[in-house]
């Protein structure tokens, strides 16, 4: 059996197996256990009572986290005319049409979010095989295909997270950084949970939010007592 590292021993000594943690207690414990030199992300995994094999039970959407993600988000926008000027004014890092598509085909994909106005989809449609696998393909269901590109840019810059159930019916999202105050992480998670509950499929039966787990990039996963969350 492999020996535990010093960090693993510290985690094992602090984390109680089988315990459900109050949210703020969990957030504080993750910060205490963080000894990594870089600023870790704090992530949430939410197990939903859905059957993701059924198309009407796939849960997807977007939430603007009230306290942001702590990340500098780079945004590219496919649009033209007055909408292009509005997107730039809203803080977009790059705006264009065919020339932007050519840049992306050439490998310039240093963006976290790609947004498009409906009239630009003729151009964006050529990039499906490039943007799709990276999770960057604009989609009206999460607000990244919209005539109001300026608002979409502002939302992305403000810390909007996009989510979709994976093959196991789990939602994964980054909800901040390890140096966030626990209350700010809690507010972000509550905003996400509120939207997930609003999007509950009518065909979903039984318990909808089955399990909530909070973790950091290099830290343990802590199961959250849902009674400690107001959502």
Swiss-Prot record:
Alphabetic keyword roster: Repressor, Ribonucleoprotein, Ribosomal protein, RNA-binding, rRNA-binding, Translation regulation, tRNA-binding
Source domain of life: Bacteria
GO cellular component: cytosolic large ribosomal subunit
Keyword rRNA-binding among UniProt keywords: yes
Gene Ontology biological process terms from the UniProt entry: regulation of translation; translation
Leader sequence segment: none
InterPro entries attached to this UniProt entry: Ribosom_uL1_bac-type, Ribosomal_uL1, Ribosomal_uL1-like, Ribosomal_uL1/biogenesis, Ribosomal_uL1_3-a/b-sand, Ribosomal_uL1_CS
CDD domains on file: Ribosomal_L1
A single MF term (Gene Ontology): tRNA binding
Quaternary structure annotation from Swiss-Prot or TrEMBL: Part of the 50S ribosomal subunit.
PANTHER family membership: 54S RIBOSOMAL PROTEIN L1, MITOCHONDRIAL, LARGE RIBOSOMAL SUBUNIT PROTEIN UL1M
Family, similarity comment: Belongs to the universal ribosomal protein uL1 family.
Function comment: Binds directly to 23S rRNA. The L1 stalk is quite mobile in the ribosome, and is involved in E site tRNA release.
Descriptive protein name: Large ribosomal subunit protein uL1
Organism of provenance: Azotobacter vinelandii (strain DJ / ATCC BAA-1303)
Lineage: Bacteria, Pseudomonadati, Pseudomonadota, Gammaproteobacteria, Pseudomonadales
Gene name of the record: rplA
